[in-house]
């Protein structure tokens, strides 16, 4: 059996899980509600406060989907009870971030867009279910992405980081707070 897939998921008291026909699972908690449709071959059972996933056969596909289903269910339960967050740091001279309403404006040293038009800032709008917090006065400037959907939080953080990934020579750019940049030595003079 899959080592991940066979582990039961403990459902907290303030979280309710409903399993509908077609393996549609809805998890409701204090932070919100998540709904996901899972592979119909997996058998998802709620017994008391434990959620278990079993697979029909030991075929390779069933084994891989078994662990995936359990991990996604666990992410849903943790998301609606505790939530997820990712912190990004902006490092560089003149690099700034400001929150205006539901939009975060990033000034990351770009003077031109890829099509040659002038570009001073990137505007990122908060999607549904995600909150962006900017600590403008902190050194380095930090942006915290929060939400109940782990995949959406990670995707939004990756989009922000992708606007100016950190470079290895000076370390300038947008990086995750726990990310270590492998630094390179510059040119050696004659």
Positions of PLM-derived features:
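N-terminal intrinsically disordered, cationic/polar leader segments
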Residues: 2-190
């Amino acid at each position: 059996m899959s080592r991940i897939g066979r582990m039961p998921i403990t459902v907290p008291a303030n979280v309710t899980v409903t399993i509908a026909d077609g393996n549609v699972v809805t998890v409701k908690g204090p932070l919100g509600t998540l709904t996901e449709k899972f592979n119909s071959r997996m058998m998802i059972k709620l017994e008391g406060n434990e959620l278990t996933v079993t697979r029909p056969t030991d075929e390779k596909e069933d084994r891989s989907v078994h662990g995936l289903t359990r991990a996604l269910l666990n992410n849903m339960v943790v998301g609606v009870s505790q939530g997820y967050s990712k912190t990004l740091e902006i490092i560089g001279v003149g690099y700034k971030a400001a929150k205006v309403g539901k939009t975060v404006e990033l000034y990351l040293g770009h003077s031109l867009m890829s099509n040659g038009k002038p570009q001073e800032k990137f505007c990122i709008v908060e999607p549904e279910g995600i909150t962006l917090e900017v600590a403008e006065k902190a050194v380095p400037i930090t942006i915290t992405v929060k939400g109940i959907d782990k995949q959406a939080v990670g995707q939004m953080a990756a989009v922000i980081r992708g606007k100016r990934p950190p470079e290895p020579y000076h370390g300038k750019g947008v990086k995750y707070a726990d990310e270590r940049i492998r630094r390179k030595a510059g040119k050696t003079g004659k």
